[in-house]
Amino acid sequence: MNMSSRIAYTLTTLFVSAPALAAPPTVFIPEGSANSVLMVQAETGKVLRRINDVEAVHGLAGAPGVPYLVAGSYSEIPRENVASLEMPSTVSADDHAAHHAPKAAPMGPPDAGISLLSILDAKSGDILRRIEVPGAVHHTAVSPDGRFAVATHPAGDGISVIDLATFGMTAFVPTGSMPNYAAFGTDPNLVYVSNTGNGTISEVDLSRGIVRRNFIAGDTPEHMAVSPETDRLFVADADAGQVLELSLSTGEKLRTFEIGGEIHGLGLSNDGATLFVAGRGEDKLASVALATREVRTAKLAPEPYHLTVIPGSDILYVSSRAEPVVWLIDTSSMQTRETVSVEGEGHQMVALP
């Protein structure tokens, strides 16, 4: 075997025997009033696909290794119009028929309209199923084991619980006034729900369909981030311009971080050492070093809104509430690397490896 043949053989062997390189993360950006979800390549912002026919999509959630994304609509449909909804092109006839099969007595407030959760394939983005829930959906969350999804209903003062094995709604759990955001820790059976209207966080047992505990959390708790390693829950007290650090074990408030102005999205760095905060009211992005309490800010305008940290990366995605743009931010310098143009406005973004 000559030298060229040996080199070619060696390279071929390496490529065949080496494990396949992991695909770069994908970011799913709900585009709100555009009725669509944009899929982009996380590192570059390159557009991969636009998923259409997801009406008034605001909430979107998934989890690593879970094959589904759950998208919530902020619009409602009169009950009498549900049967006439057009079948999405990617939904099978059997699934569509199951969706319109006779239902048991509706759960939730009796005067609630009907909203739809869309179940998306987490790889392709195809719409697989629609699920009826009682009232407009603000945010959604998916349990780490992929068993449950939840949707918050601000007008209904509770959450819907979905079994992702059967795509059935199993419970409506009253939590408090104007439930806003939902987040899981390490226990896939427990979800934490911020109730903006009464300043509490509800710990909900999803198997039992009950609230186990309520924590006091400022005046207007909205977005949250969980640090499972440290047993901490970070809560945006939006109107107060503060982030509260709570103990998940006791519900006790441990620290308060002053950001200033109205705040919105939260996200933890991949190493859990830094908390990022979207300062919507003062057009800024803030980072909090949790070990030292140091707060750094950088100008970001207009109106930074939702925020998500890209796994295994030094990039942070931040949407604008005022313009159709998402910024790709370097987590160290807090400067913009790239921008992604969106239709409508970017809401609860999901980044999956």
Name each model-derived stretch.
Residues 2-3, 15, 263:
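Intrinsically disordered, low-complexity segments
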Residues 1-9:
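Bacterial N-terminal signal peptides that target proteins for export
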Residues 19-353:
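Predominantly soluble domains enriched in secretory-pathway, periplasmic, or organellar proteins
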Residues 8-19:
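Bacterial N-terminal signal peptides
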